[in-house]
Amino acid sequence: EPYAFGL
């Protein structure tokens, strides 16, 4: 999750 959105 590189953007801390659960990606």
Curated annotation (Swiss-Prot):
Q: Which UniProt keywords apply?
A: Amidation, Neuropeptide, Secreted
GO terms (BP aspect): neuropeptide signaling pathway
Task: Quote the subcellular location field of this record.
Answer: Secreted
Leucine amide-modified residues are 7
Keyword Transcription regulation listed: no
Annotated GO CC locations: extracellular region
**Superkingdom of the source?**
Eukaryota
Main subcellular localisation = secreted
Function as written in the Swiss-Prot or TrEMBL entry: May act as a neurotransmitter or neuromodulator.
Sequence similarity? Belongs to the allatostatin family.
Q: What is the protein named?
A: Carcinustatin-3
The organism encoding this protein is Carcinus maenas (Common shore crab)
